């Protein structure tokens, strides 16, 4: 298996969490959160990340309702994914992200209690969980 680099995005209207992962280790690391204004990110910041990490794949979390149906944020996340593809020519995959924010808060709380629960950290760890879910679904046993 080639070492593939994956960038993960947890799309939000005010903040977009970003993580980087390696397929060979099936693990990911939180990078940062990018501020967004009504879902519109700072594209220059994203361009720098794409240039720096040269991802083979970009995984964008897809916020679905618990019953699997789509909502307004699902459509906005898809639009964000499509724009990433159009602007940077990167291969895109969307990944079900139900419960990632809850799981991210639990993971951060284990590491540092309430002090660790800043919005930016939660978003970046959510992006980690999106990448890890992708790896598990595509390369797990």
From Swiss-Prot:
It is found in: Cytoplasm. SMART domains: YqgFc. It is an enzyme of class 3 (hydrolase). GO terms for molecular function: nuclease activity. Its EC number is 3.1.-.-. The keyword Nuclease applies. GO terms for biological process: rRNA 5'-end processing. Keywords: Cytoplasm, Hydrolase, Nuclease, Ribosome biogenesis. Its main location: cytoplasm. Gene3D superfamilies: YqgF/RNase H-like domain. GO terms for cellular component: cytoplasm. It comes from the Bacteria. Pfam families: RuvX. HAMAP family: Nuclease_YqgF. Could be a nuclease involved in processing of the 5'-end of pre-16S rRNA. Belongs to the YqgF nuclease family. This is Putative pre-16S rRNA nuclease. It comes from Shewanella oneidensis (strain ATCC 700550 / JCM 31522 / CIP 106686 / LMG 19005 / NCIMB 14063 / MR-1).
